[in-house]
Swiss-Prot record:
It is found in: Cytoplasm. Pfam families: Semialdhyde_dh, Semialdhyde_dhC_1. PROSITE patterns: ARGC. The active site is at C117. Keywords: Amino-acid biosynthesis, Arginine biosynthesis, Cytoplasm, NADP, Oxidoreductase. One of its GO terms (molecular function) is N-acetyl-gamma-glutamyl-phosphate reductase activity. NCBIfam families: argC_other (TIGR01851). GO terms for biological process: L-arginine biosynthetic process. Its EC number is 1.2.1.38. The gene is argC. It catalyses: N-acetyl-L-glutamate 5-semialdehyde + phosphate + NADP(+) = N-acetyl-L-glutamyl 5-phosphate + NADPH + H(+). GO terms for cellular component: cytoplasm. It comes from Brucella canis (strain ATCC 23365 / NCTC 10854 / RM-666). Belongs to the NAGSA dehydrogenase family. Type 2 subfamily. This is N-acetyl-gamma-glutamyl-phosphate reductase.
Amino acid sequence: MKPKIFIDGEHGTTGLQIRTRLAERDDLEVISIPEAERRNKDLRADYLRAADIAILCLPDDASKEAVSLLEGHNSTRIIDTSTAHRVHPDWAYGFAELAKGQRERIAEARLVANPGCYPTGAIALVRPLRDAGLLPADYPVSVNAVSGYTGGGKQLIAQMEDRNHPDYLAANNFLYGLPLKHKHVPELQLHGRLDRRPIFSPSVGRFPQGMIVQVPLFLSELEGSPSLAKVHAVLTEHYAGQDIVEVVPLEESAKLPRVDAEELAGKDGMKLFVFGTEDHGQVNLVALLDNLGKGASGAAVQNMNLMLGK
């Protein structure tokens, strides 16, 4: 029998992307609740319990409710794309390239928390340096990022695209999360293995999909004052053999006049760059990804495949 997949919240931005990715798969059976019944709690519970894997594409509180509907019904495995369980010790963190053995943890888990889009890029840059001992745990990490507006869901999409919307946003780029209390920070700190709360400054650009995440560092404050080549080598070794995460060669990065946030829009990969000047003792680590690809729906499908042994 084909494994049954239920996307709870398939009409939202992330859910629609996952549904599209699964539409042509003949090795799965996607079961869907009628749209008119999606607020029927009892019927939702029936669909959740009928699934081999339930992918939750819901706000945090709704995701917690969905999980509660499966209490005592352990045959359904869960992938939660919300923030609700990303730092919960009982949930496997769904970043397959995080560390050695992470793929296996995801494959064997019943509960998988899909990473956030921004943390995916930031952790991809920070975690290898922490694991290699180059980045001190107490380093004051700063993360600057820009995302396509689809990351804000249907409401922000409407505000950016519909000029007749009462809250239409004319800005081409805007900062948010100004009090430095963004909900992604605990996730970034925990899975980045950081002792100090990182400063996270996100922004949104007037483009639908794409993302750039930057982590600038002082080489002199890293263990052994490493060269750019050493930092690059650590990233390259960490992601060796991975088909989704690519570490761009130093010589290629050195020739780039710019990095385009939309380069990977519509794709599930992620590119990592090491920029900097040895003389100044500074390095800028950059992650490029699609906020709806490796940053959301693409990662959910990757995790689903691992859980199904594919």
